Amino acid sequence: MASKVLKGIRAIAFDLDGTLVDSAGGLADALDQALLAKGLPAAGKERVAAWVGNGADIMVERALTWARTKLTAQLHKETRELFDRFYETTVTTGSQLFPEVKVTLAELAKHNLPMGIITNKPTPFIAPLLASLDISEYFSLVLGGDDVKEKKPHPAPIYLTMGTFGLRKEELLFVGDSRNDILAAQAAGCPCVGLTYGYNYGESIALSNPDCILTNFSDLLSTIGLPSLKLQEA
């Protein structure tokens, strides 16, 4: 259960990878295929999960650095292009929702809370992923890494979300799993929830000092003062 209630929330924005979706498998499959195509070793899901969160360019850069190859702009460009090609397939085949995500989104929608997604993920991959997981209908705003000049941890996409929804900073809740998510929310001045699962570079989300820390996604309901799923089932 949530230990703290955030009042006055009128809309919620979510990170995507590591928050709503366990996408490490699909990312790792595509990145490993790209690395192997360049004659480099595959990194594997566990390593790739630690590189998620700053966008595809930085993920590819981290992979090439790990492979101890000479990092050039041309190699990075070619590897990124290969990753994009392979990820067109693995973005859907290698991704699944985290537990309780869909039922919680459905419950939030019943209360007419506008919801959005703010992710550093390349924009072309987002719509197919949401459609494959059957959650597109819940989001009236989706901002990908190609939709803003500055990605998280910069607050720009959160400011854009506030403006789109017509909200003051204290009325938008941002939910994420990494320090970049929490830093972006804090810079924008909006309340934030940190999830203990997901991809946070191997460190505890508590170190980023979010307003609330949740282990179960469905506890988001009680965090904003709505009945929990367990109470509804009782």
UniProtKB/Swiss-Prot annotation:
GO terms for molecular function: metal ion binding; phosphoglycolate phosphatase activity. The keyword Hydrolase applies. One of its GO terms (biological process) is glycolate biosynthetic process. Gene3D superfamilies: HAD superfamily/HAD-like, Putative phosphatase, domain 2. InterPro entries: HAD-like_hydrolase_sf, HAD-like_sf, HAD-SF_hydro_IA, HAD_2, HAD_sf, PGP-like_dom2, PGPase_prok. Mg(2+) binds at D15, D17, D177. Belongs to the HAD-like hydrolase superfamily. CbbY/CbbZ/Gph/YieH family. Monomer. This is Phosphoglycolate phosphatase. It comes from Photorhabdus laumondii subsp. laumondii (strain DSM 15139 / CIP 105565 / TT01).
